[in-house]
Amino acid sequence: MHKILIRNNYKPLVGKIKINGSKNAVLPIMAASLLSSSSVILHNVPDLIDVHLMSKLLESLGAEVNFMHNKNYKANHTLKIDCSNINNHVMPYKTASKLRTSFLILGPMLSRFGKARTAFPGGCNIGKRPVDMHIKALEEMGAKIEIDGYNIIATVKGKLQGKEITFEKISVGATENVIMAATFAEGVTTINNAATEPEVLDLIDFLKKMGADIEIDNTKVIITGVEALNGCVHKIIPDRIEAGTYALAAIITGGKLELEGINLSDIRCITNELETIGAMVELYDGGIVISRKNGSIKSANVATDPYPNFPSDMQPQLMSAMCIADGISVIEENIFENRFTHADELRKLGANISIEKSKATISGIKSLSGANLYATDLRSTAALVLASLVAGGETIINNSHHLWRGYEAMHEKLNSCGADISISS
């Protein structure tokens, strides 16, 4: 079991952190590489467990995947993917079941090869993330989908057919899957109520570079099927969730961090709320600087909602800051129904948190105390790290392997700015 040991040295974090390419952008783009019979080269790729799991899935289908590390620092790696010799359509259960985005391989495999078999997707246990919307949309396009225990078998005779798809609610994954499926479909596919997150737009940009015919009109995406896609070179957008997490590290410790490789426009949906609680955001050539204005952290009322609103992936980290804010804060979680698991662990540090259905009420206290904690998922682990930075004494976070699914070398980056964090297995 991986453990993180954090010692509070009462130092504000000061320094520079390089922001990686987006985890939530690179994974669907890796899946989309299946649509090309030529090589694709991806730059600004993060070195994460989920990236390597997706690489294994692609390799199991016959792809050649080459991850090239940037030896200079812990970011901006390169990934070359060649899907010219795909010879299998069955994804191994053991790997697919560990990765939520394994389901995104369904759309491109159906579109290019007419068949795919995968397991129900894994990932973080943060509540229901149903794939019903994916399945319904693909069936509307002509796919036959069977569920055999924990496996999903999808086939189509001939080509998928362009259709008008209207999602009952906004779904990033379903939007991405249908976009990829529609790339080679016969005719025009229109997606109404589509997700327009930056990561979805990055996928569309990647597909268009390869030759896809895609247009966007507000929350409508229109895809006209083409015959083939070429290879391309593409740079993954910065990870706004990683940037937001480190921004909160600066605010919580009263420090000042330069976040290199991120533009303010990339994280405006996050910094708007951070400024409300007392953050100062400054621009510089190549990134932004985050610090806390004079005084303590202010309380706030925040609700998570689809882009361009505050993202659910930042909710646990924000709660950590609210634990030591002046006054009472309320966080409403509108995306996932089981995303308050970190609250129990924050209480072990002394936090005053009450949960009622989708709302968390946090009464700020002056200080936290170190404790023995257990992580449950990726973002909750990040939240516990942030809170532990200002908890008196030592804090141990058990089951911390979740962190490496979304943050490359977080402990090294924070230590370079003054933190005292060590890792043990």
Swiss-Prot record:
- In the UniProt entry, which residues are flagged as the active site? 124 (proton donor)
Catalysed reactions, as listed in the record:
phosphoenolpyruvate + UDP-N-acetyl-alpha-D-glucosamine = UDP-N-acetyl-3-O-(1-carboxyvinyl)-alpha-D-glucosamine + phosphate
What keywords sit in the KW lines? Cell cycle, Cell division, Cell shape, Cell wall biogenesis/degradation, Cytoplasm, Peptidoglycan synthesis, Pyruvate, Transferase
> Which superkingdom?
Bacteria
Q: Where in the cell is it found?
A: Cytoplasm
Q: Name one Pfam family in it.
A: EPSP_synthase
A single Gene Ontology CC term: cytoplasm
Q: Where do the TM regions start and end?
A: none
In Gene Ontology terms, what is a biological process of this protein? cell division
Assigned EC number: 2.5.1.7
Give binding positions for UDP-N-acetyl-alpha-D-glucosamine.
100, 313, 335
Which top EC class is given? Answer: transferase
Q: Which GO terms describe its molecular function?
A: UDP-N-acetylglucosamine 1-carboxyvinyltransferase activity
Name the InterPro entries on file.
Enolpyruvate_Tfrase_dom, Enolpyruvate_Tfrase_sf, MurA_subfamily, RNA3'P_cycl/enolpyr_Trfase_a/b, UDP_GlcNAc_COvinyl_MurA
* Pathway(s): Cell wall biogenesis; peptidoglycan biosynthesis
> So where does phosphoenolpyruvate get bound?
23-24
**Residues with 2-(S-cysteinyl)pyruvic acid O-phosphothioketal modification:** 124
Q: Which family does it belong to?
A: Belongs to the EPSP synthase family. MurA subfamily.
Per its database record, what is this protein's job? Cell wall formation. Adds enolpyruvyl to UDP-N-acetylglucosamine.
- Protein name in UniProt: UDP-N-acetylglucosamine 1-carboxyvinyltransferase
